Every structure is written in structure tokens, then in C-alpha cells.
Amino acid sequence: MSLTLRVLAPDQSVFDGTAEEVILPSTTGLIGILPGHISLVTALDIGVMRVRTNGAWNSIALMGGFAEVEADDVTVLVNGAELGDSIDATTAEAELEQAKAKVSQMEGQEPSTEKIKAQQTFNRARARVQATK
């Protein structure tokens, strides 16, 4: 038995195929999906989705969105996504270091739009790095 998985971003279809198992980064923690899973709709956080196909794990960096599970069909609608294999690890690491420095620089400051954007940039950069591993 397998799952039918579709990962859709506004500008592209990132994944459309079958999977043996999916691990989603929900806003309340990681959720594992296997064939026969109960119906579910959940919000997704910025993070890494893991997909097992043919016994091998693949990673997809997600930039937040929603997932629906219905009768072995998993549909993931996200703000943005990148296959881990397509991310340049060196560039992603450099972007993570820049984002980390920006967040550290703003530590102790009052909450602001700029501080929230810096934290989101850091979260996206971290997800991209994690997806390369």
C-alpha cells in the first residue's frame, strides 16, 4: 500500500507521485502519515517534510502552509517549497549564518515587524539547510 502525494506551491508542483511514508512539520510538531491514516487537515510550519519512496528518504523544505489527508491521498499546499536535492548546501549555510547574525543583533529589542521578519528569514534558512542533510 502507498500514499498518493502532491506538494503544490503557488509557482510550481514540487512533488506528484507515490510515497510509503510522509513526515510533516505541523504547527504542533511532526506528524507521521502512513497508508490508512485517519482523515486530517493541519497547518504546516516552516520546516522540513520527509518523504519515503522506494525505501529511501527525501527531504523537501516547506515555507508553511496546509496539508490534507483523505483516503491515502495527501495534498500539501505551501507558500513555497524546495527539494532538498536542488538546494546548494554551501549557499544555504551562508544564508543561515547571515540570518542567525541578524536575529542575534536584534536580541533584547522590543517586538517589531523587522524582528519578526528576521526570525522568519532565519527559520526559512534553517529549513533549507536541514533539507540538504
From Swiss-Prot:
The keyword Transport applies. It is a peripheral membrane protein. One of its GO terms (cellular component) is proton-transporting ATP synthase complex. Keywords: ATP synthesis, CF(1), Hydrogen ion transport, Ion transport, Membrane, Thylakoid, Transport. The keyword Membrane applies. One of its GO terms (molecular function) is ATP binding. It is found in: Cellular thylakoid membrane. It holds the Pfam family ATP-synt_DE. HAMAP family: ATP_synth_epsil_bac. F-type ATPases have 2 components, CF(1) - the catalytic core - and CF(0) - the membrane proton channel. CF(1) has five subunits: alpha(3), beta(3), gamma(1), delta(1), epsilon(1). CF(0) has three main subunits: a, b and c. Produces ATP from ADP in the presence of a proton gradient across the membrane. Belongs to the ATPase epsilon chain family. This is ATP synthase epsilon chain. It comes from Prochlorococcus marinus (strain MIT 9303). The gene is atpC.
